[in-house]
């Protein structure tokens, strides 16, 4: 069974509903007040956009409906039409540079043939984390700590990644526990409708907490609640402040209920991390917090500094992973012919040697299915995000002024036969596309889920590719494998694969969709 690009169709009318999922827990008066404030800020932003000039980069702009459409309207439309605007630009220009206009900034989109040229720039000329900080108003959402140093990257690359093979057993133990807490009670043969999106967030949160905080503190309910709330409050606060002129943000931010919640989350996170650090005695703890404490120097050693890094790392590790897993579950239920081959592979590997250190590396089909699902449904439509801090001229003569933001249209590239391997057309979903290619030893490493190159940049590319992608890959393969062994999944009767929601340049699995689940019994073996 194959699926076309309709998998990626967006639900424009649900944009506001998506935001409301985060707002509906607030008191009614607070929600109304937030809407009034956001509307007033948008009016201010409207005036500024109408009167101000745009990017000085001399490359084509895509997305305008006509020469009469004002820039402020194009920026606003990008919120719900970002995917189609980027795709339109890629299909039209493909091997040439173009730009898109979104709320708060213009982004210069570079094609694949420029990637190797720009990725070699030194760190003093370009920053990869700054676009994320800007998108989520880092000065107010406490993201500026990531601009001060790369402590978190050093810890992930030098301590976490080398330990991954030894963490398989630890992660499985926590996942087994998490399933007893987060999956609903089910009788044999009883199908139960579940909110798989929320379940994935909670499962990944618990596994991540075990790796982040160690066995003694990973089930701290205050930390689990804080990390869940922090991501929600950061997203809402950042999204609203993105449309507010910088000069007004100091006055608008304190009025936002989500911002006040965020401050409470930061305070709670600081308290939990501070208590753990003060209670730790000596060295030898094998968790990210301990590694970060040991690797920190100077101001990095401050509890506030470490706590904020831990919160942002939790956000990145939990929610992008949970969304990728939710996409994969939707794809699995939409293409149920993959379920038994994947389950058989897991049973074969585990039956031969148990959950040993190399078990996850032998899940070739599972790895391929996750990579193909991500190809169709990446969380980020644009990757390789950079902001230049020094003017430069590319080989074709294009001048990139200081302060310019660039990105690569990685999702559009992965719908192009020039960048998708195998005989199956890129418009068709082939869950075993990559495992078939990897059967040739020459490509055994190249097409792993966690690997990146200039054709597949879902995790970024080069020295600034996502440092946690190897951990995330293992976490997802482990979670999907255990779910396949213990449960059956299907779409509700009469339902197709849930449509994705595109907000700005992010692709989100529909959080309102449901799947049906039941326990597997011994006779299923």
From Swiss-Prot:
Please state what class of enzyme this protein is.
Answer: oxidoreductase
Q: How does it sit in the membrane?
A: Single-pass membrane protein
Q: Which residues cross the membrane?
A: 31-51
Per the record, the domain of life is Eukaryota
Q: Enumerate the GO terms in the molecular function aspect.
A: ent-kaurene oxidase activity; heme binding; iron ion binding
- Required cofactors, per record? heme
| Predominant localisation class | membrane
Q: What is the protein name for this chain?
A: Ent-kaurene oxidase
Q: Which organism is it from?
A: Fusarium fujikuroi (Bakanae and foot rot disease fungus)
């Amino acid at each position: 069974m194959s699926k076309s690009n309709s998998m990626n169709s967006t639900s424009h009318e649900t944009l506001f509903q998506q935001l409301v999922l985060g707002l509906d827990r607030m008191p009614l008066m607070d929600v109304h007040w937030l809407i009034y404030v956001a509307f007033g800020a948008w009016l201010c932003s409207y005036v500024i956009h109408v009167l101000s000039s745009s990017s000085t980069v001399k490359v084509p702009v895509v997305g305008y409906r006509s020469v009469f459409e004002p820039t402020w309207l194009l920026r606003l439309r990008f919120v719900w039409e970002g995917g189609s605007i980027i795709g339109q630009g890629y299909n039209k220009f493909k091997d040439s540079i173009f730009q898109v206009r979104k709320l708060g900034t213009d982004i210069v989109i570079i094609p694949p043939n420029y990637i190797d040229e720009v990725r070699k720039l030194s760190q003093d000329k370009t920053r990869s984390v700054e676009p994320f900080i800007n998108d989520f108003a880092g000065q107010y959402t406490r993201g500026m700590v990531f601009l001060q140093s790369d402590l978190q990257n050093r810890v992930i690359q030098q301590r976490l990644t080398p330990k991954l093979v030894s963490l398989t057993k630890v992660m499985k133990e926590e996942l087994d526990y998490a399933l007893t807490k987060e999956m609903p009670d089910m009788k044999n043969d009883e199908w139960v409708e579940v909110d798989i999106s929320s379940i994935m967030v909670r499962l990944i949160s618990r596994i991540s907490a075990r790796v982040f905080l160690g066995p003694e503190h990973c089930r701290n309910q205050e930390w689990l609640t804080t990390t869940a709330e922090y991501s929600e409050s950061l997203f809402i606060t950042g999204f609203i402040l993105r449309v507010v002129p910088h000069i007004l943000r100091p006055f608008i931010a304190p009025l936002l209920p989500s911002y006040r919640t965020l401050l409470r989350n930061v305070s709670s996170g600081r308290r939990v991390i501070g208590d753990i650090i003060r209670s730790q005695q000596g060295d030898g703890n094998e968790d990210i917090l301990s590694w970060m404490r040991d690797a920190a120097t100077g101001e990095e050693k401050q509890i506030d500094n470490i706590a904020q890094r831990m919160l942002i790392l939790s956000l990145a590790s939990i929610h992008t992973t949970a969304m990728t897993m939710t996409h994969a579950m939707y794809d699995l239920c939409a293409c149920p012919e993959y379920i038994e081959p994947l389950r058989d592979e897991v049973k074969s590997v585990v039956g031969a040697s148990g959950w040993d250190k190399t078990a996850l590396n032998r899940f070739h089909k599972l790895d391929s299915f996750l990579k193909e699902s991500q190809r169709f449904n990446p969380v980020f439509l644009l990757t390789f995000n950079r902001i230049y801090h020094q003017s430069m001229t590319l080989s074709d003569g294009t001048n990139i002024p200081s302060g310019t933001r660039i990105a690569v249209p990685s999702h559009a590239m992965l719908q192009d036969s020039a960048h998708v391997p195998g005989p199956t057309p890129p418009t068709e979903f082939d869950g075993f596309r990559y495992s078939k290619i990897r059967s040739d030893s020459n490509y055994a490493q190249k097409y792993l889920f966690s690997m990146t190159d200039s054709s597949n940049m879902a995790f970024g590319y080069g020295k600034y590719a996502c440092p946690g992608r190897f951990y995330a890959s293992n976490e997802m393969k482990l979670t999907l494998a255990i779910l396949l062994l213990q449960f059956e999944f299907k779409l509700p009767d009469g339902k197709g694969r849930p449509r994705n929601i595109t907000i700005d340049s992010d692709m989100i699995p529909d959080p309102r969709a449901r799947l049906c689940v039941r326990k597997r019994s011994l006779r299923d073996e």
